[in-house]
């Protein structure tokens, strides 16, 4: 994860209370300064601007999108709001310290100077992750070890106990980002990645991450005011994210966050945010969301996820079918078609794809005139294969997969091309 450097900030902590004697266990929570805190929200590459727009809407200041995420400022409780409401961010990182460095020991001192025992108790497990761009240091593993040592040493100076390391499911995630000359220390307020909403209870990962699905809807300006159709819905990630948008459901309402384990956690403030979110939710209207998949198991999974979000009423409001996409009529006169088709990661037979693409193009021309069709794919040959020239192509990353979100304006008998595809897959 590439976390960009941020401008040096003035000290952000309140005046330090008297430090506890070494070997004692009584540590009071240190209040966070009312002055603006600095945060960074990483996101899937390609979604930085729509995340920036989302953060502005959530009340963030000094919003600065950069490659891989968005920096922003605000009161500490803004971190609560962003964790609860951001559909696009992957995490919310709270900046704790920053300085220039030349060697590992300066990074150790930077981390050692953070008052960790006043942030969380020694009962919480920790994980340290170090990322770098153009750092002169030769071993990030050694830097990771020294940052862990700094945290442990700070605890041992204050009390008899120290936090344990848990690299799989830690309570606290500490992120350090290095540039060629600057080190920045962050604490992850989210805990588990924010795309883990809580409605996918089978424990299985989706082919399309939830925040990428929500980000694509934002890129296409979908706000719940026009029909949405996913003809290859799989387990329903796009449809479920769309339902949450249309119903104004906070994406983090079903999960917990790491900030709830911090000593300075303001439970009343967070409970108020949750109550406001619950009061703002609304029912899903029928005739808005349409989904299909040729797999009965996929359709059943989609229904379960919709039920987990809004109960049976929500699942019943979404029109779901199980059929070959090419046999379907348009579910409405027009709207947004958004889908994640197979592209080798889900169908291993390239020959099958090559014969399938023309059938998709014929179906789009025959049945879907008046719609905008958008497909995210790692296969650059999709536009030429279906015989349409994309009106837009947006680079996106689905995990490690370098993808394109192709958009096609569908007009009966127009903008169709049977020419060989351009090397970039545009059909131009």
Residue ranges and their predicted role:
Residues 1-35, 316, 366, 408-428:
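Basic Arg/Gly/Lys-rich low-complexity intrinsically disordered segments
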Residues 38, 42, 46, 284, ...:
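Conserved Class I SAM-dependent methyltransferase catalytic core
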Residues 133-136, 192-193, 342-346:
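A short, flexible beta-alpha/helix-coil linker loop
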Residues 185-219:
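SAM-dependent Rossmann-like transferase core, predominantly class I methyltransferases
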Residues 208-329, 346, 350-352:
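Conserved S-adenosyl-L-methionine
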Residues 334-340:
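Short SAM/SAH-binding signature in class I
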